[in-house]
């Protein structure tokens, strides 16, 4: 608990000319768990409409949005990994009359791309990685004049993670996923309105009553609309070993989503079950840290035979009570969200408690929860962490920006024994016992081949991304 990930994207195109704006807004609400800082939509012939805050607040702007109607458009939910959290960096981003773009991920080699962009556009705004890569795309499009071939060229220059939705001036919508498939992206259809949809997760399709078709394959661009009036797919990069983010399955994604053929809820239950089987602890009650750890706690309880109960509840009736701590842009905001988690003393007092959480990142959230459990009278506190120790930064779209901010690294730098790391983290947090899942257990729980998942934040293996070094700008 306590990390951020870059955003959710959405796109829609109706072959029947149906207004897709209501679906975009509902779709963004369905992706709210992926970002809480800002939201926005783009349709042909209108300025991008974007606001700070949560997507369901669109109702406060209903009068302004009433003029936004169109048969195609894109939307975005933002949490910042690069660039400051302000309206200027909110997305979608419009580039003249050519296109608007929404991005989930992080582009690593922005410095190299920036030099190329600035060579012909010295005044270009390159304040975020999305703006840099979009400027470069614009340059290539002027030479290629074909979206499919443009991405074939762009892919050879860009290093990083990207799932894009793009709206061009012709009203076509494109869904693009990087060759490794770091971030999720899928397409679906709303049959009644003839609307094809692209979204970060299938839960957004459910939100607009659309049917899932398939994932966008890594290295694939799909055009919604266009001359074929359905969808058209093109592979812009050769097939390489995928590197799907393993953290999506334990924390980021919505439990109802199916990503790369795996139901997230089942993966989380499995990871709890496997953790209980491999790391047995004695306790009287299993308590999840709300909300993402609930399925894992159920799995842990089922496997261990220790009853599960709700000992921590989010106060959803106070400011920020229902929000996610990991994707708050500032530490103070993260702590405020966690302090809205209220212990239920009757469940906790006098008991040996096993707390199941999805991860330990910076450790500040865990410290607050542990203190709350102590104050509620827990006899002992043991922790089961479903994601292995996070020891390295992420350059593919998650806010693990520097080793020094990672608790496991701070207390166990250089250590490779997962049990020793767990013991040192337990001591730092003031708990009686703490056990992590390991990479093999996590891969087994997810149900995908181990070599198709990214574990770089755990083992520091960035070979699929390329040679990388820590970069200060990733703290932005």
Model segments located where?
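Flexible loop/turn segments at secondary-structure boundaries
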Residues: 81-82, 109, 173, 182-183, ...
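Phosphate/diphosphate-binding loops
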Residues: 204, 211, 219-220, 274-279, ...
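Conserved short alpha-helical segments that host acidic/polar catalytic motifs at enzyme active sites
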Residues: 1-218, 223-284, 289, 349, ...
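Hydrophobic alpha-helical segments characteristic of transmembrane helices
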Residues: 256-257, 282-310
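Short, glycine/charge-rich flexible loops or terminal/linker lids adjacent to PRPP-binding catalytic cores
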Residues: 305-353, 363-367, 391-402
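Secondary-structure transition/capping motifs at alpha-helix termini
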Residues: 143, 280-284, 302-309, 345-349, ...
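PRPP-dependent phosphoribosyltransferase catalytic core
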Residues: 155, 170-172, 177, 209-215, ...
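A conserved beta-strand->alpha-helix junction
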Residues: 126, 131-134, 308-323, 427-446
């Amino acid at each position: 608990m306590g990390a951020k990930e870059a955003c959710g994207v959405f796109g829609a195109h109706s072959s029947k000319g149906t207004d897709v704006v209501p679906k975009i807004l509902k779709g963004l609400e369905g992706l709210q768990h992926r970002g809480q800082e800002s939201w926005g939509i783009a349709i042909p012939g209108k300025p991008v409409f974007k606001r700070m805050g949560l997507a369901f607040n669109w109702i406060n702007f209903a009068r302004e949005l009433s003029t936004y109607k169109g048969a195609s458009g894109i939307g975005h939910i933002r949490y910042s990994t690069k660039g400051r959290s302000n309206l200027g960096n909110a997305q979608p981003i419009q580039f003249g009359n050519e296109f608007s773009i929404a991005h989930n991920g992080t582009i690593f080699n922005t410095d190299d791309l920036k030099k190329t962009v600035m060579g012909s556009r010295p005044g270009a705004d390159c304040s975020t990685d999305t703006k840099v890569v979009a400027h470069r795309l614009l340059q290539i499009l002027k030479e290629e004049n074909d979206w499919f071939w443009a991405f074939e060229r762009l892919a050879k220059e860009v290093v990083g993670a990207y799932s894009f939705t793009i709206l061009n001036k012709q009203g076509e919508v494109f869904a693009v996923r990087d060759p490794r498939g770091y971030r999720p992206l899928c397409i679906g259809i709303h049959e009644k309105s003839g609307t094809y949809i692209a979204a970060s997760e299938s839960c957004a399709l459910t939100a607009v009553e659309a049917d899932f078709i398939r994932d966008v394959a890594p290295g694939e661009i799909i055009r919604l609309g266009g001359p074929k009036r359905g969808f058209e797919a093109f592979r812009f990069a050769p097939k390489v070993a995928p590197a799907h983010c393993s953290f999506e399955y334990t924390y980021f994604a919505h439990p109802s989503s199916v990503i790369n053929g795996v139901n997230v809820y089942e993966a989380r239950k499995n990871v709890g079950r496997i953790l209980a089987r491999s790391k047995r602890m004695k306790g009287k009650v299993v308590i999840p840290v709300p909300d993402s750890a609930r399925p894992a706690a159920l799995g842990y309880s089922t496997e261990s035979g220790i009853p599960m109960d709700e000992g921590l509840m989010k106060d959803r009736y106070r400011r920020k009570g229902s929000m996610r701590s990991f994707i708050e842009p500032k530490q103070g905001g993260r702590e405020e969200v966690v302090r809205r988690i209220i212990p239920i003393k009757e469940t906790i007092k006098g008991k040996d408690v096993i707390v199941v959480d999805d991860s330990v990142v910076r450790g500040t959230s865990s410290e607050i929860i542990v203190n709350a459990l102590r104050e509620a009278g827990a006899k002992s506190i043991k922790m089961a962490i479903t994601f292995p120790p996070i020891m390295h930064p992420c350059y593919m779209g998650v806010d693990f920006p520097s080793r020094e901010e990672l608790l496991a690294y701070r207390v166990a730098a250089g250590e490779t024994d997962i049990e020793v790391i767990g013991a040192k983290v337990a001591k730092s947090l003031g708990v009686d016992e703490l056990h992590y899942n390991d990479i093999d257990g996590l891969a087994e729980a997810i149900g995908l081949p181990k070599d198709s998942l990214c574990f770089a934040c755990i083992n520091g293996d960035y070979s699929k991304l390329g040679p990388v070094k820590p970069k200060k700008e990733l703290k932005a």
